[in-house]
Structure formats: C-alpha cells, structure tokens
Amino acid sequence: MTIKVGINGFGRIGRMVFQALCDDGLLGNEIDVVAVVDMNTDARYFAYQMKYDSVHGKFKHSVSTTKSKPSVAKDDTLVVNGHRILCVKAQRNPADLPWGKLGVEYVIESTGLFTVKSAAEGHLRGGARKVVISAPASGGAKTFVMGVNHNNYNPREQHVVSNASCTTNCLAPLVHVLVKEGFGISTGLMTTVHSYTATQKTVDGVSVKDWRGGRAAALNIIPSTTGAAKAVGMVIPSTQGKLTGMAFRVPTADVSVVDLTFIATRDTSIKEIDAALKRASKTYMKNILGYTDEELVSADFISDSRSSIYDSKATLQNNLPNERRFFKIVSWYDNEWGYSHRVVDLVRHMAARDRAAKL
C-alpha cells in the first residue's frame, strides 16, 4: 500500500522533496503525492518550475498538466510520470485544507509558516494523520535527524515532528560519530558558511529585525545567526549546552559548509578522527555521512543527496605543544538536495513504524 502524501508549500524545499521522490523511483510506487498546496493552483506554472531549475538543471521526468474536472477554468492537476497530483489553494488555517477528503495521511509542511507545533496540528484537524515540518520547530514538536535519533520516533505519541534544519542535518551526524566513537565533545563552536536563500534580498532592502540581513545577498558575506548547533543538543542529549554557533551567508546559490571547532574529552589525533569518520561513512552512517579526500569545492557537491560530506583534507589540530584535544573538522552539504532527501527518508521511516504499530 502506498503512502498518501500532501505537500503544503510548493516552494524551494517542497519542489526539491517532490523531485527527490521522482529521482528515487518512489512516486507512484511507495509514495503517492496526492496534492501540492501553494498560493496559486496554476498547474502549468508548477510544471514550468519543476522542468527548469537554475541550480539542479532540467527535470528528468515527464510532466504535463490537465484539469481535475471540466468545470475548472485552468489546468489544476500535474501529471508526472503518469501520476496525477492535484494543485490545491493555500489556506491561512491548515485545518481548512481538504486532507481528509483527499485521503492524505502524511503532510510535509514546507511553507515555513507553520513551524509551531500547535499551528502545524491544524493539518491533523484537516484530516491528516502525521505532519513533518521541513524546518526547525517549536512548541514541543520532536526533532529528528535521520541517522542520528530517528529510531526514537514513537508512532503513538508523536504526530507532528520536525526534520530540523539543513545545517543541523549536516552537523549532527559528525557529532554523533564523535560521541559514538568515544572522542566526545567538551565544548565546541560551529560556523556554517551558507549559500543565500529565498528569504534574503537581491538588492539592499528593508530588514528591520536583522539589519545586515537586508543587504544584497549576491554581493556580500553576511554574518547571521543559526540555531543549528544548539539544536544538536535536542537530538544528542549528551551534548546539550556544549555547542553554539553562527552563520555567514555567502554569494553562492547552493551548497554550504560546516566548520566545527571542538575540544574532545580525551586525547586523540587527526588520523584517528579521520579513520572513525571514514569508517562510519561506509557502515552505520552510509548515505547520510559522506567522506572525501579529494580537492573539491562547493560546486562539486551540488545535487549530492547525503546530509554531510566530511572533508578530510580540511581537518586541523591545534599546534600547541602536547595539545591532543583541540580540533577543527569541516563538512559540506547541499542545503537543498540533501535536506530534501532526509525529509523523504523521515516520512518513509514514520510510515513503516506506524504500520508496524498498526496505526
């Protein structure tokens, strides 16, 4: 039986999630995307947005449009690889979306608007069974990072969950390996050098709450905030309060990189850390954590579906005499593509656990 999914918000992440489903051969086989929701319902425009992408290139699948019924004025249905997806008008209150009528079980909440648990619960009142927020969430929604704490999902108690942020999905696997392999973290500082996103300005504009954030994204390196490091403490409790960080938004359209400087809880070496991360990337963190020892730059990671790709050539150790605990490690991530694949993975994981619990 296929998983019935609705995507609320067919913007950057919503479309990338949909494309990930298609590229992985899941659409119509394991997952049935019943509907996508956005401010307009013009399927022809949605089709155009999917066909052509300035970063990830042309859509690799067949896409056309049709009408859901003869009485509608414009095409309101996408047809992708022969599968029909209804385009639904966005609502101020998610409870007003017709999830129950459409048979949708799992909603991917990717508008960026309903990130508080109580607001996202509107989807449940609309007839959905579960909600995955594709952003950091507040108000008591449990946060999951695939490969790190996804097995803590409780089908009977957790109905609205968060897939964390793209940066947390890059950082948490690194920290998970460091903790699991016994290196530990006494304290650490993280910086993400992050590509600009849709919330930024193309030219200098008004940004009353974040003055620097109002400057032209493609012309500046912009210091910013991130909750990614602190969020790691939510998924790896032993690191609670030990990590904090900041961001630099930079003039690239996609791919970001995490720089983690930390003090281990025991003496170790670059060689030992490198070996542990390489081993993890081939075993228990495969397809989540990657490893590279090549001379790569950001463009080389565009459309990489892994959450975090550790750069072994960038690892540093403090050069003070007898210092064996102070290190810097670096990891790349496609902040769009890798993250979108983890959203899909989380939905699949939840559905499998829900079926096992006979929900």
Curated annotation (Swiss-Prot):
This is Glyceraldehyde-3-phosphate dehydrogenase, glycosomal. Its EC number is 1.2.1.12. It comes from Trypanosoma brucei brucei. The lineage of its organism: Eukaryota, Discoba, Euglenozoa, Kinetoplastea, Metakinetoplastina. It is found in: Glycosome. It catalyses: D-glyceraldehyde 3-phosphate + phosphate + NAD(+) = (2R)-3-phospho-glyceroyl phosphate + NADH + H(+). GO terms for cellular component: cytosol; glycosome. One of its GO terms (molecular function) is glyceraldehyde-3-phosphate dehydrogenase (NAD+) (phosphorylating) activity. The record marks H194 as: Activates thiol group during catalysis.
